[in-house]
Amino acid sequence: MIIHYLCTTLFFVFINMQRIVLFDIVKALCIVLVVVGHYIPENSPVWYECLNKLIYSFHMPLFMFASGFIYMATKKEGESYSKFLVKKLKRLMLPYVVVSVIVISIKMLTEKHAFVENPVTAYAYIKMLYFPEAGYFLWFIWALWWMFVIAPLFATKQKRLLLLGAALLLYCIPPFLPEVFCLKQFQSMLVFFILGAVCCDWSEIATSVKIPFWAVCLSFAALEYFYIRFDACHSVIPFVGIATIIYLSDIISRGAKKINGLLTISATSYIIYLFHTTFEGAAKAALQKFAPILLDDPFFAVGAVLVISAGVAGPMVLYRYILAKYKLTQFIFGIKRQQAASDRLPAA
């Protein structure tokens, strides 16, 4: 019942749907949370472990929600199903294959000379075709692909409401789909993607009711306390976390005079997702060699900021000066020419 209540509340309340810039900000905040969440060294202090647990409680559902909303907001009427899937293959799966080959090759070339987390064998080049072998975080791309396979089959608002009900049921029952092709993650994330699509469908209703921001934040803080302290409220937190970040993004979009930095991060969010662990790993290796004191208390926070900054800024520089510059890299990383010219990267 409480999950149903939170879904309904989110459905009717939390989004200023008329302003796509809101979801640019959501994407920017979300990708930063992803980069922070994926830096968790073994010697992390307790406060950082708690922060990491908090981020993991909702950040990927938030990403799925934003993807579902943007899918509906940018959906082309009359586009054939086959053409849509081919487009998503180019935008999602081709970059996934290319990045997987690059990361696996780097691991195989360096693991004999330096420490490599999650070392691989030559079989990884085959396994990556059905499992995110290059890096487990790449499961998101597989799961998002399945969202795009399923969602267009439910072509009306009413059908998407039925799909939302089915997705909520899949979310509530224990996972039963296999991990191959990341179907297990697809099962748990479908509800958030479809919820985003449904909220876009009914945007005129969603803006008619208001809940105070303080009430949303208080609910989120209380649930996170019980989650971190007692390992409870797993199923509920993602919905409240989504609402909190969307509310925060709406405040930023209306109140900030300059949000170009966030919009730039949002524009390169997919490239950041693909490459952030590579740049974080390089930054961590550099600190281990030249400034190991920054990897432990009392300077852990300084080192963490440097590594996380590399995870965000590195892919942005790569995108601007290499990937968006050449036709070949534009093709293999799913970057449209007009998009490269404007330095904007739409949601996958």
Residue ranges and their predicted role:
Residues 4-348:
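Alpha-helical transmembrane segments and their immediate juxtamembrane cytosolic regions
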